[in-house]
């Protein structure tokens, strides 16, 4: 039997040994990269992940590499890696959502929208896909579509605070004060100490001739966070408008 192995199977031995070494090296590089990433040593983590995917371009390690690139603000490299993941497995919703996030950071709203649409084709019940589509629409100056997408996100996730906040901001930009105020009230019912919501509520109240209530909102923000610069600015503007110079 040894003779047959030497005659017919001998050529497999070096390859088998190489596969074992590759697997071992891959695991070492991958988990060294994870440890380095957790310690904030991004250049070393990236190097480990790059060498690991050169051995085995599995999705998990590619995802780790894309995240490390993003953390290091190497957005082009992150995008290339995510495109590579999408080509390798085009059925992964999270890949397209991550790609949409990178496009948003690069202000590439057309490709962001495209990534979101691909995510929605795979899963049209994911509220994040609609939320990111709305952000792409805002970037493209399409507020009507943004409102529609945010509404769909909220239908799917009734406590989606970020979607309520963003929809309120868009509605207020469109001078729809009543509708914006309703979203803010819903948001504050979910989180009474939401600084962004309180500031927007104050802005709306100030613009609709409710200065005292507006100031209460700004004061509440400052009591929560004395370093909130926007609260000071809005409060100062309110004083100027109402000529309350003594304060």
Task: Describe the role of every protein-language-model region.
Residues 56-57, 90, 124, 158, ...:
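Short coil turns that delineate tetratricopeptide repeat
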Residues 39-47, 72-84, 106-118, 139-152, ...:
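Structural signature of tandem alpha-helical TPR/SEL1-like repeats
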Residues 101, 169, 203-206:
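Alpha-helical adaptor scaffolds
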Residues 3, 7-28:
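TPR-adjacent "capping" and linker segments in tetratricopeptide-repeat scaffold/adaptor proteins
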Residues 26-27, 59-60, 93-94, 127-128, ...:
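Helix-start (N-cap) detector for alpha-helical repeat units in TPR-like alpha-solenoids
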Residues 20-21, 53-54, 87, 121, ...:
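Structural signature of alpha-solenoid helical repeat scaffolds
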Residues 21-60, 64-71, 101-107, 135, ...:
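Alpha-helical segment of the N-proximal tetratricopeptide repeat
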């Amino acid at each position: 039997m040894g003779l047959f192995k030497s005659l017919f199977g001998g050529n497999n031995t070096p390859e088998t040994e190489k596969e074992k070494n590759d697997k071992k090296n891959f695991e070492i590089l991958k988990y060294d990269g994870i440890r380095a990433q957790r310690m904030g040593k991004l250049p070393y983590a990236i190097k480990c992940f790059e060498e690991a995917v050169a051995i085995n371009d599995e999705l998990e390690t590619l995802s780790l590499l894309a995240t490390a690139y993003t953390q290091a603000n190497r957005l082009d490299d992150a995008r290339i890696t995510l495109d590579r993941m999408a080509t390798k497995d085009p059925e992964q919703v999270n890949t397209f959502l991550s790609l949409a996030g990178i496009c948003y950071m690069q202000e590439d709203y057309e490709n962001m929208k495209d990534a979101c649409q691909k995510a929605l084709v795979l899963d049209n019940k994911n509220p994040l896909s609609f939320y990111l589509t709305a952000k792409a629409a805002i970037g493209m100056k399409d507020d009507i579509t943004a409102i529609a997408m945010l509404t769909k996100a909220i239908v799917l996730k009734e406590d989606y605070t970020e979607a309520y906040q963003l929809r309120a901001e868009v509605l207020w930009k469109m001078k729809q004060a009543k509708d914006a105020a309703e979203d803010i009230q819903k948001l504050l019912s979910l989180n009474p100490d939401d600084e962004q919501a309180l500031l927007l509520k104050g802005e709306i109240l100030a613009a609709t001739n409710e200065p005292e209530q507006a100031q209460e909102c700004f004061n509440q923000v400052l009591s929560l966070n004395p370093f909130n610069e926007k609260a000071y600015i809005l409060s100062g503007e309110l004083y100027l408008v109402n000529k309350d110079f003594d304060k």
